[in-house]
Swiss-Prot record:
It is found in: Membrane. The chain crosses the membrane at residues 104-124, 131-151, 177-197, 226-246, 274-294, 309-329, 346-366, 421-441, 471-491, 501-521, 533-553, 583-603, 653-673, 697-717, 733-753. InterPro entries: Oligpept_transpt, OPT. This is Uncharacterized oligopeptide transporter C1840.12. It is a multi-pass membrane protein.
Length: 791
């Protein structure tokens, strides 16, 4: 039965009005409020104006979109639709709700400074810790409410009649969203922080804090410009849901709305449900992370029965094995790919199919047949080896200028790659070509059509935002031009970093070209395909034997790409939460500049003022293990990457995956247009290749348990108990992530950092580290390796 059209009258004097209708569907019964959410209006108690909102057009739009995007054979539910997000995203707006307040800006700058500074500091420490942006979202709410209760309602008079209120009232949803947007940008600077550390401590180039800020500003301003120009393509289209931002939007709803509709006989409110799950997640995470770490690796129990067995550890191990037994009680392990509760079921199917085929079928076949002598090394590792089975020390084959010395290379050892590393590179290249071919095949519908229809969207979110002025596209273009100027100054002003302006320009062009295709995939699947290997391959062939040039080529392009995608995510949050577009632009612009200053200043200060930092003699374990790993990787790629992957190189076959990706993309496209109503329309060819490219950082236990949880929630529960899923699924996702994030901080700062866990040991803490799974036992002995000729 079609939901009736009606007009909802909203009076600001009445809070929490609800309108309920029940829609009977042949698949399930949905309790909804004419898909316009439960609480209609946030209001200002000081004003009593009257507003009429007609949602009939939105209802028809939602029905059309839902039918077009989610009707699949067998009534299976594959996707997250526009109708689903109406349960947690407000479909009303009050222009009188203050967003750009003094309180918001102070809290945003304060939280961003603390979190970004802590992240930059602890990046150099082992073990490291990072604070997720969702922690700021949680902390901001009590801080905002505390501000409301203790700060007097004074006004500051500024020139030209401007008045700034110190306390504009209760901490509201828009302020909360703005604060989160600001912090989310500031905490995404790990890549550029790593570059500063590599340059100063490992390459020995004294770039100084000023040049570090210049590099950061160049990256952020370019990202801001591209993300702004792409708003009509990536943010405004209502079919681009961006599932990765929905859990944050769900938290905004439960903190600022009080509605409580019944779902499958569950009457518990979203807020109460969130705190129950949050507390349970917080308490439980202490067990797999500290008290009983074996719970995190339960899938490896078969290898524990015989720890010395290399074969058992290779098949069932979860650290250096395939992880064939899907069992873990650690949410951090389950959600290491992405949060499975917010990943659409079609994307889960594509990604897990990719993993099963490439990692559980192809990879073992190549490994046990000993192609390229990979059976002499661990089956699942990202290390690079010598012919003697030791970790490769690239500093033994370079001169004082960090350039390759061929004679030293021949005397030392050729580079030997493990099978997981090889497959990772091959799949990354295949994902690139598949993604780009699909992008060009769908260019009219994915790019041209959104641009042409930017003023014609009939969804309620776009309609409500039409009352606000948008930023002129010229401002974004100017930002890109300024970033290019800063990049030219950085590359041509000094001559100690091996890269010139032409390399910088090409890197930025590649990053910009990849930005929209990658964002389109993430906006639909919540999964990010890594292009790191592609950037490194291009740089390795272009800057032959110049690892420092590779580092900057990779950092300029990949850094711009990452920041632009973060900014687009944040812009979508602003779109959902009805934050004025000009304010969103101001937040993104300001946060990028502030992040450049804070991260560069903290990292640079530590580099120049902390004694022995990034050495084995460093105090407080400030050994920079993660940046050192990245340094070794960039060094090897820059020195020999072009040789080992060229036509006469030992691993040249990976280049064929450019063709493999293109063929897969064309075949899938032909099947989709030939059978438009079949399940092929949900298949993404880039995910069929890039879905498994996260290995060896994550293994089988991560993929299999992630897919199992996604199947349980996003297929079984959604299909059988849709009203429960619609009300509680995203709340569950947010609560689990928040519980783990907060518990991780408590464990680190209260126990690990203070040394409290150093003497805590029993079977549950040692069993997973006692055998071949931890050591990475190889199938064949390293003594039997025959040194390959050439590169």
């Amino acid at each position: 039965m079609k939901t009736p059209k009606f007009i909802t009258y909203v009076t600001r004097g009445f809070k929490g009005l609800e309108s309920k209708s029940v829609e009977n569907n042949k698949d399930h019964i949905v309790e909804n409020s004419s898909p316009i959410a439960s609480k209609f209006h946030e209001f200002d108690e000081q004003k009593k104006s009257f507003e009429i909102i007609n949602y009939a057009g939105h209802e028809k739009f939602v029905d059309d979109i839902t039918e077009r995007e989610s009707s699949v054979p067998g009534n299976a539910v594959y996707d997250i639709t526009v109708r689903d997000i109406d349960a947690i995203v407000p479909v009303t707006d009050d222009v009188d709700i203050p967003a750009s307040t003094f309180r918001m800006w102070i809290l945003a700058f304060g939280l961003a400074t603390v979190i970004a500074g802590v992240d930059a500091f602890f990046l150099m420490r082992y073990p490291s810790v990072s604070i997720a942006a969702i922690v700021a979202l949680l902390v901001a709410y009590p801080l905002g409410q505390l501000w409301y209760y203790i700060i007097p309602q004074w006004e500051i008079k500024l020139p030209r009649g401007i008045r700034v209120s110190l306390n504009p009232g209760r901490f509201n949803r828009k302020e909360h969203a703005c604060l989160y947007i600001f912090v989310n940008i500031c905490v995404s600077a790990k890549l550029v922080n790593t570059l500063i550390i590599e340059q100063i401590k490992f390459f020995g180039v004294n770039i100084g804090i000023g040049r570090a800020i210049l590099f950061n500003l160049c990256s952020y301003l370019s990202s801001f410009g591209w993300s702004g120009l792409a708003l009509p393509i990536l943010v405004y289209p209502p079919t681009l849901i961006w599932p990765s931002v929905l859990s944050s939007c769900a938290l905004f709803k439960i903190f600022h709305d009080n509605d409580n509709t019944k779902a499958c006989n569950w009457t518990i409110s979203r807020l109460r449900y969130f705190f129950i799950v949050f507390v349970a997640s917080f308490i439980w995470y202490w067990f797999p992370d500290l008290i009983f770490p074996a719970l995190s690796s339960l899938g490896a129990w078969i290898s524990w029965c015989k720890p010395s067995s290399a074969v058992l550890s290779q098949i069932f191990g979860v650290k250096t094995g395939l992880g064939l037994f899907p069992l873990t009680l650690d949410w951090a392990q389950i959600s290491s790919l992405s949060n499975p509760l917010i990943t659409p079921w079609w994307a889960t199917c594509c990604i897990f199919t990719s993993f099963v085929f490439w990692i559980w079928i192809v990879l073992p076949g190549l490994y046990y047949q000993n192609y390229w002598q990979v059976a002499h090394f661990p089956i699942m590792t990202n290390s690079i080896y010598t012919v003697s089975g030791k970790s490769y020390d690239a500093q033994k084959v370079v001169d004082s200028k960090w350039e390759l010395v061929t004679q030293k290379y021949q005397e030392y050892s050729p580079v030997m790659l493990p099978i997981a590393f090889i497959i990772n590179i091959a799949l990354s290249l295949g994902a690139f070509s598949s993604m780009m071919i699909s992008f060009f095949l769908r260019f009219p519908t994915d790019v041209i059509q959104p641009i042409c229809h930017v003023f014609k969207y009939s969804d309620i979110h776009t309609k409500l935002l039409k009352k606000y002025k948008r930023v002129h596209w010229g401002f974004y273009l100017a930002s890109i031009i300024v970033s290019l100027g800063l990049g030219f100054a950085f590359t041509e002003g000094w001559h100690d970093i091996q890269i010139r302006s032409y390399g910088f320009v090409v890197s930025m062009v590649i990053g910009a070209a990849l930005y929209i295709p990658l964002s389109l995939i993430e906006s639909r699947s919540s999964f990010t395909i890594s292009m790191q290997a592609f950037f490194e391959i291009v740089a390795a062939f272009w800057f032959n034997g110049q690892p420092m040039a590779l580092l900057y080529f990779y950092s300029f392009g990949f850094g711009t790409l990452q920041h632009a995608m973060h900014m687009t995510q944040s812009a979508k949050i602003g779109h959902y939460m009805k934050v004025p577009p000009r304010l969103v632009a101001a937040l993104l612009f300001t946060s990028g500049i502030w992040s450049s200053l804070v991260n560069s200043a903290v990292t640079g200060w530590i580099m120049y003022h902390v004694r022995d930092v990034c050495t084995s003699n460093a105090e407080n374990n400030m050994t920079c293990r993660s940046p050192k790993t990245q340094f070794n990787s960039h060094l090897i790629w820059g020195l020999v990457g072009n040789h080992i992957f060229s036509s006469d190189g030992r691993y040249s076959f990976v280049m064929w995956f450019f063709l493999v990706g293109a063929v897969v993309s064309v075949v899938v496209y032909l099947l989709q247009i030939s059978f438009p109503k079949s399940s092929w329309k949900h298949v993404n060819p880039a995910l069929l290749l890039g879905g498994a490219a996260q290995i060896p950082s994550v293994t089988g236990i991560n993929y299999s348990t992630w897919a199992a949880v996604a199947f349980c929630f996003n297929y079984l529960i959604r299909r059988g108990y849709y009203s429960w899923w619609k009300k509680y699924n995203l709340i569950t996702a947010a609560a689990m992530d928040c519980g783990v994030a907060i518990a991780g901080l408590f464990i680190y700062f209260c126990v690990v950092y203070t040394g409290g866990s150093s003497n805590f040991s029993w079977w549950g803490t040692t069993v997973s580290s006692a055998g071949c799974d931890k050591k990475g036992c190889a199938h064949l002995s390293v003594s039997d390796i025959s040194k390959p000729s050439g590169w």
